[in-house]
UniProtKB/Swiss-Prot annotation:
Thyroid receptor interacting proteins (TRIPs) specifically interact with the ligand binding domain of the thyroid receptor (TR). Requires the presence of thyroid hormone for its interaction. Interacts with NUFIP1. Interacts (via HIT-type zinc finger) with the RUVBL1/RUVBL2 complex in the presence of ADP. The modification Phosphoserine is found at residue 72. One of its GO terms (cellular component) is pre-snoRNP complex. Zn(2+) 1 binds at residues 3, 6, 22, 26. A zinc finger (HIT-type) spans 3-34. Keywords: Cytoplasm, Metal-binding, Nucleus, Phosphoprotein, Zinc, Zinc-finger. Its main location: cytoplasm. It comes from Macaca mulatta (Rhesus macaque). This is Zinc finger HIT domain-containing protein 3. It is found in: Cytoplasm; Nucleus. GO terms for molecular function: zinc ion binding. SUPFAM superfamilies: HIT/MYND zinc finger-like. InterPro entries: BCD1 (IPR051639), Znf_HIT (IPR007529), ZNHIT3_C (IPR048371).
Length: 147
């Protein structure tokens, strides 16, 4: 599996069409031509699968919850537990998240029906792009983007 733009090893998948990409720059190029209906069979299969419902467990350790979340994703889409902790420790990210507009965007994205459509729209907003770039900079510190 390779990035659809630069053919490097991918680290992410497009939320709309699930094609692999490796960086913010490649995602931006891809989203210009993204076709969310490119994989309708996969969407039908996923929607036909029963969703796993888990009973909330009281006093469950945060690390265990994060580990369970990580285990639910595809291998190449995973973010390491350490990188998730680094996101939580980032002063820059915390500062961005103090912005009420960004917080509302995040709530809308979390609660939205068509997350891919919302993601495409939000990636046009400079504040959201700054947030995404900040997250990627923490998760991929070796990647230096010209943005």
């Amino acid at each position: 599996v390779v990035c659809v733009i630069c053919l490097e090893k991918p680290k992410y998948r497009c939320p709309a069409c699930r094609v692999p990409y490796c960086s913010v720059a490649c995602f931006r190029k891809h989203k210009e031509q993204c076709n969310p209906e490119a994989r309708p069979v996969e969407k039908k299969i996923r929607s036909a699968l029963p969703t796993k419902t888990x009973k909330p467990v009281e006093n469950k350790d945060d690390d265990d919850s994060i580990a369970d979340f990580l285990n639910s994703d595809e291998e190449e889409d995973r973010v390491s537990l350490q990188n998730l902790k680094n996101l939580g420790k980032s002063a820059t990210l915390r500062s961005l998240l103090l912005n009420p507009h960004l917080r509302q965007l995040m709530v809308n994205l979390d609660q939205g029906e068509d997350k891919a459509k919302l993601m495409r729209a939000y990636m046009q907003e400079p504040l959201f792009v700054e947030f995404a770039d900040c997250c990627l900079g923490i998760v991929e510190p070796s990647q230096n983007e010209d943005s």
